[in-house]
Amino acid sequence: MAKLNHSKKTLNNENFEAELQDRVNQAISKISGKSSTIESAISYALVNPGKRVRPLLVYLAADAIGLDLEKVDSLAVASEVIHTYSLVHDDLPCMDDDDLRRGQPTLHKKFTEAHAVLAGDAMQSLAMDLIVNDQNISADQKVRIISFLAKTIGYEGMILGQAYDIEFEDKSVSKDEIIEMNQLKTGMLLEF
């Protein structure tokens, strides 16, 4: 990916979005062709247009500390892949049971619930694979990043927040509980 034009890094910039989409497409191409349905499901989820806030934050943070933006491509794309996998799982009938995401049918509506679960799981491992295979990241940094991600998206983070979301459906909750749930589901991943 070419270095982003310093003066044009905004959420509404078409060049930024096109460059980021190119990186997402390259990430998708890492998936072998063993299951064309899963490949199609992952592609459908990732290319469905979103705001791409998380990758933008990765690039802005890198720029703020003077890093070459190309050196954080895998981190930026991984953040979007993880976010997308969380949305795929969140949309499932056993969770929020949403029919639309980003103006399109949710993945389990376009494909099947089983394919949505598998595609989400595959996106999680794809994000880790992007980081592990990035030659711009040292082995020590990879361990720290993967450890942080495991905590952030695992049972102490995003998954716990989703569990709270399910539990809160049937009871009255306080403002503090809602804030904690949102911090776990969304806020922790933004720290990435």
Tell where the protein language model's regions lie, with residue ranges.
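N-terminal amphipathic/basic leader segments beginning at the initiator methionine
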Residues: 1-31
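Mg2+-dependent prenyl diphosphate-binding active-site environment of isoprenoid biosynthetic enzymes
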Residues: 15, 19, 28-192
